[in-house]
Amino acid sequence: MLIDHYIMDFMSITPDRLSGASLHLIKAGGKRLRPLITLLTARMLGGLEAEARAIPLAASIETAHTFSLIHDDIMDRDEVRRGVPTTHVVYGDDWAILAGDTLHAAAFKMIADSREWGMSHEQAYRAFKVLSEAAIQISRGQAYDMLFEETWDVDVADYLNMVRLKTGALIEAAARIGAVAAGAGSEIEKMMGEVGMNAGIAFQIRDDILGVIGDPKVTGKPVYNDLRRGKKTLLVIYAVKKAGRREIVDLIGPKASEDDLKRAASIIVDSGALDYAESRARFYVERARDILSRVPAVDAESKELLNLLLDYIVERVK
């Protein structure tokens, strides 16, 4: 993908170990959902020229996403992502932290460099502001996610607020920045941001589902990771708070055995939490689709591809 080449060229820096750590997860693969949303939004609203201008902006979104993954993996002590050992497992915590910091800075440098790709000063400023806001929201979301591991005083509203920040904010930014690249006005930018936010919430709910029933060989991540960390996913909250299956409280967390986690997963499925989560994911995808239908398109094919991407979000198996 063109975005990958851009990032790899950009991050071809010395020392080699820093470059290697920074690009470890990029080279491992991934969905590239966020930069794809940026590029499709730019083309939908401004045609092929806008899409070409958006390449460094789309790369900045993926670079920021990769930075957040590296740091999240350190905090969660996750050992596998995208089917390979995580960055801190391969390079150690110190190098992984440094790689994340470097990617974070690189994401904003890419936006500055977008001026050389035909972006105006105002467009670059708007994109910079959007990503800056998203970066703060992501950190807030991660903070809530960590705090929720320490308590059971978490309800669906708390969960949704956390997800809007941790996952929704960057996908919202991806869509808004695509609109900025196309030269769209503030109202269209806002509407595309709402498309991205709702898609992001659905994406995270689907992630929660795959954390319970996903195949590790397909997802590239160990199953039950969220349960092992004691994370308050939508499924866990529903099973405990809505279905009254409080035995889950004693079956998840860092001290839980593999049998405990399997039993917790079985209880979650039996409680109806899986069906509930799937229905909520579809609700947010349909909300995104409704908003998207009201956005005028210069390129109809790109709009259709965005609609297909919404389908993928709730149907994906990894």
From Swiss-Prot:
Record keyword Magnesium present: yes
Consequence when changing residue 177 to M: Produces a mixed population of C15 (FPP) and C20 (GGPP)
Provenance organism: Aeropyrum pernix
CC cofactor: Mg(2+)
Chain positions recorded as Mg(2+) 2 binding sites: 72, 76
Quaternary structure and interacting proteins, as annotated: Homodimer.
Function: Probably involved in biosynthesis of the precursor for C25 (sesterterpanyl chain) moiety of C25-C25 diether (2,3-di-O-sesterterpanyl-sn-glycero) membrane lipid. Catalyzes the condensation of isopentenyl pyrophosphate with the allylic pyrophosphates to yield all-trans geranylfarnesyl diphosphate (GFPP). Geranylgeranyl diphosphate (GGPP) is the preferred substrate, however methylallyl diphosphate (DMAPP), farnesyl diphosphate (FPP) and geranyl diphosphate (GPP) can also be used as allylic substrate.
SUPFAM superfamilies: Terpenoid synthases
Details of cofactor binding: Binds 2 Mg(2+) ions per subunit.
Name of the protein described by the UniProt record: Geranylfarnesyl diphosphate synthase
Catalytic activity: isopentenyl diphosphate + (2E,6E,10E)-geranylgeranyl diphosphate = (2E,6E,10E,14E)-geranylfarnesyl diphosphate + diphosphate
Record keywords: Lipid biosynthesis, Lipid metabolism, Magnesium, Metal-binding, Transferase
